[in-house]
Amino acid sequence: LKLHDIPNTVNKAVEEIAQFNILMTTIHLQGGAEMIEAAKSAAGNTKILGVSLLTSLDENDTSELYGNSFDDQFTKLITLAKSSSVDGIVCSPKELISLHDLNKIKVVPGIRNAQTNDDQKRTMTSQEAYAQGADYIVVGRPITQANNIEAAIEEYLA
């Protein structure tokens, strides 16, 4: 669940999410400062994580969508995150190196321990992501679509 809507709608959604004692939920940083603050004001103990750019996007996508290079768009979103009350950042492992001085939670999707042919364009292994400063990793299909889910989980924990 990645929230991205007008501030009032995001505020009400986060208010509902927070009632379930959820540890973290995500919002798109592209929703802007007012939306971020609306989410935080309703979060209670739930941490609000700001999604930077989806791991399925690359340079061509950001140029087409935002008229910016990937790096410029990422920098704009991280600058917004730094000046906001967001508790953490969701970004691909490839961008972690630029966040070493950021004192916020770092959640990293796009984790692949083997070469895959899926829609993830900016990936890294779990070990590489942790070495680059990830606090949490997100592994989806390599686990949920594995023939042996327990073995797949062990592979990512190793």
Please describe what each predicted stretch is.
Residues 5-97, 102-105, 112-116:
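Conserved anion-binding
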Residues 2, 25, 81, 129, ...:
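Conserved, mostly hydrophobic/aromatic
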Residues 107-109, 128:
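N-terminal organellar transit peptides
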Residues 131-136:
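Internal alpha/beta core interface subdomains
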Residues 109-122, 139:
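Catalytic-face loop-and-helix region of soluble metabolic enzyme cores
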Residues 36-42, 130, 143-158:
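C-terminal helical cap(s) of enzyme catalytic domains, especially alpha/beta-barrels
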Residues 90, 137-139:
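Short hydrophobic alpha-helical runs that function as membrane-insertion/retention elements
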Residues 95-96, 123-128:
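Short glycine-rich, acidic/polar surface loops and turns
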